Amino acid sequence: MAQVHPTAVVHPDARLHETVEVGPYSIIGPQVTIGAGSRVGPHVVIEGRTTLGERNRIFQFASVGADPQDLKYAGEDTELVLGDDNQIREFVSLHKGTAGGGGATRVGSGNLFMANCHVAHDCVVGNGCRIGNGSALAGHVTMEDHVIISGLAAVHQFTRLGKHAFISGGAMVTMDIPPYATAQGDRAELVGLNTVGLERSGFSKEQIERVKEAHRILFRSKLTLQEAMVRLRAELAGHSEVDHLIQFIQQSKRGLTR
């Protein structure tokens, strides 16, 4: 049986693995599922149709699975789904999805949500991401894997952040950030490549050089984006890291930060 502090309120219909720990004064609703090895600290609220995988840790005063801050929301049965090994720090808020956004907010595994950050309805967060203190994702934002957002940054709704991108502190992001890039400012602009992040993620020197050349063609060559894409396909297509960059740009709807 899960270890539940006597002051916590866990609905009898909630499904908690026997190794789950729930701290003082926390509240867990009837549609909540929490996987093995997860730890819920004091004064946490987990509600709605929320599913947490294994070994997640939720710190005090976090709000997980609350209704979306969307005036169109009318009580539809939507959900929040998290994978494994996530850390949700103090005063973080993660909201469930809306019917108009696919019905779910989805979070992968191995992510760190630092204190006071917010993930809005219908966001998709990949694996190995970091969101800094006080930063916020508006609704329908997509973060690919291994994206880092520093503190006090904000991301506009429907924006996409490419994998291994780095968003500097205080940035206001209103357009898609391409994979591997570093962006900063209000409104955010590209200032270089996240080389340190790529090295830490195990990219080879050859892969990093190809990414550098791809970014040079796209963002430093004075070509139009269409012209740069033609050149990029001709010179560097066929390598997975470049092919992903090409695909990301092709799928952009908000436009690309350059």
UniProtKB/Swiss-Prot annotation:
Enzyme class: transferase
Record GO biological process: lipid A biosynthetic process
Keyword Repeat: yes
Keyword Lipid metabolism found: yes
Pathway: Glycolipid biosynthesis; lipid IV(A) biosynthesis; lipid IV(A) from (3R)-3-hydroxytetradecanoyl-[acyl-carrier-protein] and UDP-N-acetyl-alpha-D-glucosamine: step 1/6
Gene Ontology MF terms in the entry: acyl-[acyl-carrier-protein]-UDP-N-acetylglucosamine O-acyltransferase activity
EC numbers, comma separated: 2.3.1.129
InterPro entries to which the protein is assigned, alphabetical: Acetyltransf_C, Acetyltransf_C_sf, Hexapep, Lipid_A_LpxA, Trimer_LpxA-like_sf
Gene Ontology CC: one annotated term: cytoplasm
Cell location: Cytoplasm
Catalytic activity: a (3R)-hydroxyacyl-[ACP] + UDP-N-acetyl-alpha-D-glucosamine = a UDP-3-O-[(3R)-3-hydroxyacyl]-N-acetyl-alpha-D-glucosamine + holo-[ACP]
Keywords (A to Z) from UniProt: Acyltransferase, Cytoplasm, Lipid A biosynthesis, Lipid biosynthesis, Lipid metabolism, Repeat, Transferase
Chain's role: Involved in the biosynthesis of lipid A, a phosphorylated glycolipid that anchors the lipopolysaccharide to the outer membrane of the cell.
Family statement drawn from the similarity comment of this UniProt entry: Belongs to the transferase hexapeptide repeat family. LpxA subfamily.
Assembly and oligomerization: Homotrimer.
Annotated protein name in UniProt: Acyl-[acyl-carrier-protein]--UDP-N-acetylglucosamine O-acyltransferase
Species of provenance: Myxococcus xanthus (strain DK1622)
